[in-house]
Amino acid sequence: MAELMTWTNEPIERLPQFSPYLTNFNGLVKREGGPANAFPDAMRCIDLDAYEKGLKKGIHNPTVDAVIGVSSGKSAELALIELRLNYKNADNLSPTKLEEKVSCSKDILSGCGKLHLIVYFVFNKQV
């Protein structure tokens, strides 16, 4: 039987290099075209796109939208989340570009803690 996982802010709040980029997860979901208040108000995330843009001017490496903390009770991990809520057609999705986002995000998070094995891609119902 699979272990029940839940969100936790602990693993993202202990990373000082990302503290300027911590944001409310509901706010990020809404900015990406999702519903308001779908998650608990206390749930925070690292806005990895904002982090990458704040790091350097000009060309930015592609990253997933958010990093959240998850826990099964034993240990906390960092989970990568890509929100594709504005997409209307699956043909507009590029597996290569999505893989690049994951790869660049993992590079940024290298040494920051254990990464959850599953990367979550969230789409709207039409895709």
Go through each PLM region and give its residues.
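Short, solvent-exposed secondary-structure capping/transition elements
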Residues: 75-78, 114-115
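Acidic-basic catalytic patches of nuclease active cores, encompassing PD-(D/E)XK
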Residues: 1-59, 70
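Beta-rich catalytic cores
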Residues: 62
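Catalytic cores of nucleic-acid endonucleases
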Residues: 86-127
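Conserved catalytic cores of phosphodiester-cleaving nucleases, focusing on short active-site segments
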Residues: 66-68, 77-86, 105
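Short, flexible beta-strand-to-coil junctions
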Residues: 69-74, 125-126
